[in-house]
Amino acid sequence: MTFAPAVFLLALSGAPALAQSAPAPRDVTLKAADGTTLKGTYYAAATPGPAVLLLHMCNTTRKSWEPLGPQLAAAGIHALSVDYRGFGESGGDRADALAPQDAQRIVTEKWPGDIDAAYDFLISQPGVDRTRVGAAGGSCGVTQAVNLARRHPDVRSLALLAGPIDPDGLAFLTQTPWLPVFAAAAADDQYDDSAPEMMQWILSMSGNPRNKFSGFKDGKHGTEIFGPHPELPRQIVAWYADTLVKNPADPKAAVTVKNTPTRQFWQKASTPDGVGAAVQLFYDTVERNPRAIVIPEAQLNLLGYGHLQAGRITQAIQLFRLNTMLYPKSANTFDSLGDAYLANGQNELALRSSEKAIALLKDDHSGEERKKAIRDSAEQKIAKLKGDKK
């Protein structure tokens, strides 16, 4: 079934020496284009300098950035965190009371303008250098941070914590290799077993040689990692001190893209005639180095469905089979493979894959809503296939 997306420490140096004492954080009120009230917290630095916009996860509020905001200000980097509409102290219909389709509509139609309003507020503050801005996002905020950079070329650095990226954001990063990206995730992420792989994949697709990944064995999801790992906020401060203060990223500078095996795999697998070569590249590469290619389950699943919906069934089967090999405990990978086998008229294989998906659900770590969707999808195929046998 298709779902929109969601080794360790590559250490950064410690945070830079603290600057002058920054003013106390202050709560601010912003207005969205339609008049909706948005609440934020502004962390002003004591001296002029760059700034960072902080975008929270969809199971938290702007307060989740409190371990980071004051540290940025103390390092001479202004920062603003903001509650999305429907979250925290911001106005709008409560996000947790909306039907999924209504919530997604607001994310698509309203959030970009709301985040732009927060960005405009940030760069208008005294002392903020509007040519050196960063964005940080956790979970659902990852896509929002990347797409903010897509809309505003003065965003020169990103920090992304355990979240997926949408097609527009992915296309932007692959076409903007000068933009440096920091990413972090924990292996015990309760929402995505492959969160570390997802974040390393994003870095590989970006190709910037300055990209950094910080992985943790524990810490759970996104900004939740701040609790057991106070070194993560310090790493993010050090990241922005490097990419916005000491050595600001320059969109006009020549960049030698890191053409990693992961990036090569995706370039091949995204083309109609390149899937076979991509799969062969995968096997050849991992035979030499099992960790050389990073493929997140959700992204490979979406890529497979892209081929399936375009009528390239054989290519879809190749990718879905690879996904079941990489993630053999995932019910969704087998349900997706069942879809492709069914489309190809391979009914016995479709039945086996669907039954395997059902069997895996009892130990699947997905949320209940997602598990129900997988079960419904697999059971529909099983009923059809067993009915056809009668």
Where are these regions (language model features)?
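N-terminal cap/lid segment of alpha/beta-hydrolase-fold proteins
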Residues: 20-45
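The serine-hydrolase catalytic nucleophile loop
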Residues: 58-70, 84
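Alpha/beta-hydrolase active-site loop
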Residues: 64, 100-126
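Conserved alpha/beta-hydrolase
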Residues: 72-98
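Primarily recognizes the serine-hydrolase "nucleophile elbow" in alpha/beta-hydrolase
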Residues: 117-178
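The feature captures the conserved acid-bearing segment of alpha/beta-hydrolase catalytic domains
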Residues: 157-215
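C-terminal catalytic histidine-bearing segment of alpha/beta-hydrolase fold enzymes
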Residues: 208-270, 377, 386
